[in-house]
C-alpha cells in the first residue's frame, strides 16, 4: 500500500470551523472545546464565531505534542506554553 500525504494551505483569510480544526489535528471536537474552556485556545478576534486560523491549528498540534511527549495534563501544558510564549525555554 502506498501512503500519500496531503495538505492544505491556510491563507490569512481562510478559517477552519471547529470540526475541520479537530479533524486536521486528529482530535475530537470535544477535545478542542476543552482547550477553549481551559483557556488554552481562543479563536482570533477577527474570525467568525468558533473559527480558527493556521496559528490555532499549530497551537492545538503543539498542545497534543506536549501532552504526548511529557505525559502532561492540560494544566502542565498551560505552564509550558506560557514559558514558550515568553521565550523562556
Residue ranges of predicted features:
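Arg/Lys-rich, alpha-helical DNA-contact motif
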Residues: 2-25, 29-33, 37-89
